[in-house]
């Protein structure tokens, strides 16, 4: 229930679960430009943590601060700033996390991930660039599709997108103002509309809170489904001028976005989609923007920057994992080069559009997922089947392809492997293989996963060691079958069905793989 203190409406969350979102809000001044000239900051303290958090102006005279507590304790907070001539204090309690709340995803075992509570997290992502800026009905359909999909991460943008099959106007814009008239845009002329298109009239120092409120709704709905929100902060596909704002406006945007979104446990920061195609931003700019997010996000969410033609220097300390656009055959080498988790977020898309990046077969996309996995990394899904209403890669809606159920099968195989992720192991020259990243688990379980891709061997010889008995499964990654073919010792031959997309799983007999 709202409180009124000296004529000012104020309220805050009295109880929140661990890794949930606490929120304080209060009326404040509307004089001048509150987005630019007003501040609200809170100090949160418990027995085990102390954090200072920046808040934001949410429009209509309301200021907010959000906080994600990491301990089941009593917290005290103090709120101050020039949004008001008052200082506010209060306490709230933090309860145990609910069943599906595992906290934030963090890097684990150098090349892999886990949640805050130690639960393993294996990214199986998809891309829907502006699903969040579609109609209510289409958003609801996307969420229902995701509910029944194998995907536990989704990449999407804050800014709308102008591109092939993306000529319609978004549901909202991030700033106050008016857009270029898009009524005459077609698939034939959409490329003629760029960030300098005449007719745009924006105030880049005044945000549209409703745009951000809606994205927060989408983040929250993803959280309910256990899906990570990989938020793309900048991209080059723009007819409104959002990609060519001044550095000062970019910095204001980053601080505002971090203040609004950071308290959601499922947020990841993707600084750009195809950073190198945004020609007006230098490496020095990207480094400065990265530091703004690092300083503005008190929870240290995962951070990456996605490439077009040229990789970013992923050795930079602010980059937590590599977000890559390439075919996955280089995964093992990227692990060596960067010493970080490898997530190949774009490996081309299953579909039938005219462009080569969007018309590979489902068999090829599934092969790429397995190649990424069996080279020690993680793949990303996308789908571009022609549809007058919605194409998954950008708008969401329904999945039409044949790869998702095979990706779900691969995810099951991955989750059955020993915890802690898998690393590449050199075996024969013409095969790829992964074993547990943890050397003790590798020795204890003897787990090996081989993948043969487009090769069609009729048999293979294997030799793990001479002392242990190993059980062998033949996995058909396309037909989604697992066949146990017995137990073996020493050097042994396994007859295979002379089909593409086969994997072979070997582990010590009698061991329960956990």
PLM regions with names:
Residues 16-21, 489-491, 499:
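Solvent-exposed, conformationally flexible loop/turn segments
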Residues 43-56, 474-492:
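Solvent-exposed beta-strand/loop surfaces of large extracellular or lumenal domains
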Residues 243, 279-284, 353-362, 395-396:
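Short, flexible/disordered intra-domain loops and linkers
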Residues 11-12, 33-34, 352, 365-486, ...:
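Aromatic- and carboxylate-lined catalytic core of secreted/periplasmic carbohydrate-active enzymes
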Residues 7-48, 53-56, 91-97, 430-433:
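Non-catalytic, glycine-rich low-complexity segments
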Residues 99-329:
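Active-site mouth of glycoside hydrolases
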Residues 43, 49-112, 117:
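Extended acidic/polar, glycine-enriched regions
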Residues 300, 316-389:
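Catalytic-core region of carbohydrate-active enzymes that cleave or remodel glycosidic bonds
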